[in-house]
Amino acid sequence: MKKIITFLISSLILMSSNIVNAADKIVFGTNWLAQGGHGGFYQAIADGTYKKHGLDVEIMMGGPQMNNRPMLIAGKLDFLMTGNLLLSFDNVRNGIPTMVVGAFFQKDPQAMISHSGQYSNFSDLKNAPTVLVSKDGQFSFWKWMVNAHGFKDE
């Protein structure tokens, strides 16, 4: 009887103790060098939020000499931040297994900027000698500007 009670007490102690597991290692790639919009990801490392939730997160910055997209496909990254859904659509088109797991901006934050007083609407801007548009913009809002406002690819 003493052996049974000892076994039961030992079992209860083992079952009630917290089992410490190693944190899940995750490598997260950003779409550019560290900037304000990425701040929360870095803050979660600094203040221990990821560790608190069982994650060991490493952030791999993107940038002018770093294309993180192939790193995701090669398994060097677990998650990748992109500027918009165009890369995800392209991955689907090319049969690359991709899953979108979160959207952090409700809209794709892009802007057209000019010096004060030169251009007050799209019709004025159409007459500008040069309009510089980001690569992402060329495949999203620029197509709308060409169709709706008569801009030209020149």
Which residue stretches match the model-derived regions?
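Bacterial N-terminal signal peptides
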Residues: 6-16
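Sec/Tat signal peptide C-region and signal peptidase I cleavage site
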Residues: 18-22
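Short, glycine-/small- and polar/acidic-enriched structural segments
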Residues: 25-154
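Positively charged n-region of N-terminal signal peptides that target proteins for export
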Residues: 1-4
